[in-house]
Every structure is written in C-alpha cells, then in structure tokens.
Amino acid sequence: MGARIAYLAAGIAVAAWLAALFGCAGGGTFNSGERAPWRQQAEDECVASGAVQASAYVVQMTPIDGPGVCGLERPLKVSGLSGGAVAVSPPALIGCPLTAALDRWVDASLQPAAKRYFGSRVVEITQIASYGCRGRNGNNFGKISEHAFGNALDIAAFRLANGQHITVVNGWWGGPPRERAFLQAIFAGACNE
C-alpha cells in the first residue's frame, strides 16, 4: 500500500512538472462545452512547424473525439524520442506539442544531466500515464487533467546505457544525492520548455 501511494505521489509530481512543458491551462467538466480553440491551434501550429515527424517511433493514430471535451485531432503513438535514441515504454499516446517539447527536453536537459551525474545516456523512459479522459489526480469531479488532451505524461523511471535504473519515487524522496540532483535538474529543465 505504501509503495502504491508513493508511486501515485511520484506520478502526480511528475505530471505537474511535465505540465510546465506546454503551459497547461483550464479545467472544466468532461461533458460540458467544447474544447478550447487554442488546443487545436497549438496542434495545427506544431504539425505545420515540422517539429515532429512521423517515423517508426512516432505514429499518427486516428482522431479521438470524446467523451465530452476529451480528445485529440492528431494523437501520436510515441515509442521513442530524440529520433528513437530514447525509448518510451510503454508507448505513449500524446499530442504533437507535448511530443515536440519532450524531444527538446530530452536533448537540452535530460541527456546533459544524465551525462553530468552518471556519465551515461538515458536510453529508456518508463511512463505510467499518457492520454486518458480523466480528472486531475484521478478525480473525475474536479478539473479535467491535461491527460484528457494528450498534453501530459507521467514518468516513473529512466534507464541509462550503463544499466542503471532511476525511479522517480525512490530517487526524488530519499535516493542517493546524485539521483536527487539528476531528477531536480531535469525537473528544472522541464520548466524551461
């Protein structure tokens, strides 16, 4: 039970941290209103920019419309970032703006921090929640989570090329000093996206 609460707390912390990657906004209820127009505009601008390209690691899926305001016009199944150099396991269902932000974050923050603190590169990100029509923190009676629009990814762990495995729950709270420093550095880097 304690481990489950710790993983939930870690997921919440990482979701809040990754929300900074795309400047999440707004909430509301699932079955009222329409998706805010800026969401589609951000998606269209991202696609038009060419920041995210279809590949063996990024595959466009069929549109998700609903229930209610939930959904994405162009969901992407992402199994790798940074040109496939960093696996995403299991593959994440997210939108173009978050995919582009994650690619930038991997290159500008994640890899430099891994090299600095461990002398190795990150080769895999373990995610525990991507697209899902739900409320924030799993509360379906509160504001809608950015997961409901493909704008959030909960990360549980990182695997390095040297075989080291760093979990958010253990590293953030009471892990070795360099694991904590690594996680704090990549958290700060996410805030710059």
Language-model segment annotations:
Residues 1-24:
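Sec-dependent bacterial lipoprotein signal peptides
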Residues 25, 29, 144, 151-193:
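Catalytic cores and adjacent binding grooves of peptidoglycan-active enzymes
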Residues 45-126:
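Active-site acidic/histidine clusters and adjacent loop/turn architecture
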Residues 116-150:
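Active-site-adjacent substructure of cysteine-protease-like catalytic cores
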Residues 18-42:
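Bacterial Sec signal peptide processing site at the extreme N-terminus
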